Every structure is written in C-alpha cells, then in structure tokens.
C-alpha cells in the first residue's frame, strides 16, 4: 500500500498553469506524491498548454479540468495556489494542510512565447521544490 503525500495545484480555471504544474509535479514528485490539480472553475485544458508540455516531451492530453474537490483539499498535505485569484478565493483549508502561493503569469490568450516561459518557470519551481523541499 502506497503512503504518498498529496499535493494539490490550484488556479482559476484549471486550464493552463495548474495543468502544467500537475504534469511537472508528476515528473519531479510522482514517486513520493499524489499530484492533482483543480480550479475555482473548470475551463477545459487549454490546447496551448497541451502543446507547450508536448514540446518538453510531457503528454497531458489525458488530464482533465476539474473544480476544487473539498475532500481532496481537506486531506491534501500541500496546497499550492498558482495565481492571485485562486489564492484570494480558495476555500479555507484545515490547519494541518500546508498552503503556499507560487504566483505565475496567466498565459491564456497571450503570445506563444508566454506559454513557453510560464511552462519553464513552473517546471523550474517544482524541480526546486523536489530538490530542496522549499
């Protein structure tokens, strides 16, 4: 029986940032963590997020866009908000749930280079967490 911790990445629409974070999380943390993502709303996975991750050989076509699940939120070991809106309106978490904010620009509707930059920034941040625990 696995006894993995759970990390829950949250953003507004579970469309871009949290989808990319889930993918990077599975790559860098998947051996020790259950990696999940959700949004305040579910906007569907942005095709450019799929394309951006494909560029780094990570396939997210099977990931789904989901709204925040209260049960997962209450049982997560770590909740990471990726945008100010999610940080501001995220439901309260119990005291035992560690919550941190790692803010990233919203690439939706932006130039392709913004998707690539945000993808790389999220990947680097999660890799740092995997290596240092911070």
Swiss-Prot record:
The active site is at 11 (nucleophile), 83 (nucleophile), 90 (nucleophile). SUPFAM superfamilies: Phosphotyrosine protein phosphatases I (SSF52788). It holds the Pfam family LMWPc. CDD domains: LMWP_ArsC. This is Arsenate reductase 1. Belongs to the low molecular weight phosphotyrosine protein phosphatase family. Thioredoxin-coupled ArsC subfamily. It is an enzyme of class 1 (oxidoreductase). It comes from Bacillus cereus (strain ATCC 10987 / NRS 248). Disulfide bonds join 11-83, 83-90. Keywords: Arsenical resistance, Cytoplasm, Disulfide bond, Oxidoreductase, Plasmid, Redox-active center. One of its GO terms (biological process) is response to arsenic-containing substance. One of its GO terms (cellular component) is cytoplasm. Catalyzes the reduction of arsenate [As(V)] to arsenite [As(III)]. It is found in: Cytoplasm.
